[in-house]
Amino acid sequence: MKTYTNKFHDKHIYLYIENSEISTINDFDHLIDEYQKPLQVGVDSDNDELIELLVKNDFILKRKCYEVEVTKADLKYPLENADICQCHYGSSEYKKCCQILYDYYALVHYDISPLTASFDDFVSTLPKEAIYMREDGVITICAFVEENEIAYLATSKSDSKTRRVFLSALLTFLFDKYQYIFFEADDTDYFATELKDIFDINIRNSYDTYIKYYKKHETSIE
């Protein structure tokens, strides 16, 4: 079993566990006591042996991440076009999209593993192209794309109808260029989930996040 940290989510200690190690692991309390931080493990949803170990040791399932590969034929309904814009690294529009994503990413990750990276460090990892839509002249919704991958979606204050319009226009734009589109959708990310739900697909497996909390995190009821 290996431990490591993630500077983007530095409030947790991450564990990597091989299935061959499962029989040798008795408990995780010594790691909790040593690091005094929650322990986080990523595991394939069909890895029953490892999941059994985690649940037995008070790890909680906090997130399911679905990897999605789709074509236009998978759509539940026809797409409608709308006006969307492209921007690239270095432009003021790109920076605004980065800020929207930074805030949105922090929001949807807060209850799982809070974002601890600075804005500049976060932006340095992003694709250099973003697609966005304005409401009343203000950018409120965007996607970061890299070829046929939708890497990130974010919104600041748009409603569900506006998000549907944006997603429809985004998919129209991408399907005009590519046969296949890829993206990941966490079940804790409502915007990405809305994107996944546009398609008539059945994804059986997911990549799941389990967390064991440090005792100071817990609230006792007297």
Regions found by a protein language model. Give the residues of each.
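Short, well-ordered alpha-helical scaffold segments within catalytic/effector domains
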Residues: 25, 94-98, 116, 164-168
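Exposed alpha-helical structural elements
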Residues: 27, 49, 96, 114-121
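Acyl-donor-binding surface of acyltransferase catalytic domains
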Residues: 20-83, 166-172, 180-218
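A broad structural signal for short, well-ordered beta-strand segments within beta-sheet-rich domains
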Residues: 38, 150-152, 178
